[in-house]
């Protein structure tokens, strides 16, 4: 397995690659973008969900992915989350001047979902809501929780997802990924009042 981060910390754009016996991924991400995205993953529903993070988080995302989808999509989704999370963490650098925290409550027809994040350098993930089961094309619905957990772990962030109510599984998924984009946008944004300070009384964030 090889992970390669190109440009280690680049406030404009970061490129990263990951290659294992199960997947090969090329990623380009700009956390302070305009919500532009381009995907080539062979997993249409996954692309649909990632587009919501990009559009609502104003994160430019260019992703090329090839994985062992003849088995299932697990490795492809998991490894993408690992690479995206690692890239988020590295691109934020010392996190000076960012808000650090973000949360958003989003409605998607009959569904109401809240997502809250803390980019403070510590991992925690909690999902509360209906069981995610079934399939969207070749994508197993339960993989969304795998994606979120691995994203939080590798971005070193707290991520709480609460689906308050609603049972249309497509709407539930859309609400989660859209709210995640919105919450990340808030947390990543520069706090002008902070004057570039580290958002922690410790004076440092990992």
From Swiss-Prot:
EC number: 4.2.1.19
Subcellular localization(s) per the UniProt record: Cytoplasm
Amino-acid biosynthesis among keywords: yes
Cellular component GO terms held in the UniProt record: cytoplasm
Main subcellular location of this protein, as a coarse class: cytoplasm
Gene Ontology process terms (BP): L-histidine biosynthetic process
Keyword set includes Membrane: no
Reaction equation(s) it catalyzes: D-erythro-1-(imidazol-4-yl)glycerol 3-phosphate = 3-(imidazol-4-yl)-2-oxopropyl phosphate + H2O
Gene3D superfamilies (alphabetical): Imidazole glycerol phosphate dehydratase, domain 1
Record keywords: Amino-acid biosynthesis, Cytoplasm, Histidine biosynthesis, Lyase
Pfam family, one: IGPD
Pathway: Amino-acid biosynthesis; L-histidine biosynthesis; L-histidine from 5-phospho-alpha-D-ribose 1-diphosphate: step 6/9
Single GO MF annotation: imidazoleglycerol-phosphate dehydratase activity
Family annotation (HAMAP family): HisB
Protein family according to the UniProt entry: Belongs to the imidazoleglycerol-phosphate dehydratase family.
NCBIfam families listed in its UniProt record: PRK00951.2-4 (NF002114)
Protein name: Imidazoleglycerol-phosphate dehydratase
Gene: hisB
